[in-house]
Regions:
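Alpha/beta-hydrolase active-site loop
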Residues: 50-72
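Structured core elements
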Residues: 2, 34, 78-81, 88, ...
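Non-catalytic peripheral regions of nucleotide-handling enzymes
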Residues: 2, 23-24, 86-90, 100
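Alpha/beta-hydrolase-fold enzymes
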Residues: 70, 74, 88, 92-194
Length: 195
């Protein structure tokens, strides 16, 4: 089971045949299951805009674990989490463990933040004041746009992901080269505010 970040699309580990982790895993004999997170829209009327972290754990990760167990007929599965997908996966497995369930044989985490005491460069964008303002704005429902999330993450590496394109595209009139990872990075999803 691969749990990708819910702030981007699922295909980050399956961009093209020549650089696909999914393809490699299948070629090694693994049955691969990949979570595709829902992209909540403002027009949705089913309450997705009020979904919480706990909802993503229970109805997302733990439901996916159960599906993989059922289809594979294995009580314990291998799981890989990427970015915030890894944070969700680790949280879900901690919840399962607290309930006496141990559904995973092996756990692999890629670029996953688990200790939020020292968040590094993220502190530039998120501090307690900012978090409280977002809570007031979106804590009871609504969506944080994927575009806003992508812009924030681009500014974590402004030289490569912002100014390079300002100079090349705007000032020099160049077209940016096609690059699968940049396409994926700009193909974001919205998040429910309470999440």
């Amino acid at each position: 089971l691969i749990v990708p970040p819910c702030i981007n699309k699922f295909y980050v580990l399956d961009l093209q045949p020549e650089n696909s982790f999914v393809r490699h895993a299948v070629e090694q004999g693994f049955s691969v299951f990949l979570v595709s997170w829902r992209n909540p829209l403002a027009s949705d009327t089913d309450g997705i805009d009020t979904a919480t972290w706990e909802d993503y754990l229970q109805e997302g990760v733990l439901a996916a674990v159960q599906v993989v167990q059922d289809i594979s007929r294995h009580e314990r599965i291998n799981a890989l989490g990427f970015c915030v997908g890894g944070t969700l996966l680790a949280s879900a497995l901690a919840l399962a463990h607290a309930r006496g369930d141990h559904p995973v044989e092996s756990l692999t985490l890629l670029t996953t933040l688990l200790d939020f005491e020292e968040t590094g460069v993220l502190d530039v964008f998120v501090d307690e004041t900012h978090a409280q303002a977002r809570e007031r704005q979106l804590g009871h429902g609504g969506l944080m746009s994927g575009r806003e999330l992508a812009t924030t993450f681009s500014f974590l590496r402004p030289s490569e992901l912002v100014w390079n394109y300002v100079v090349g595209n705007y000032l020099q009139g160049q077209s940016p080269p096609a690059f699968d990872l940049l396409f994926w990075n700009s193909d974001g999803t919205n998040l429910p505010g309470p999440f």
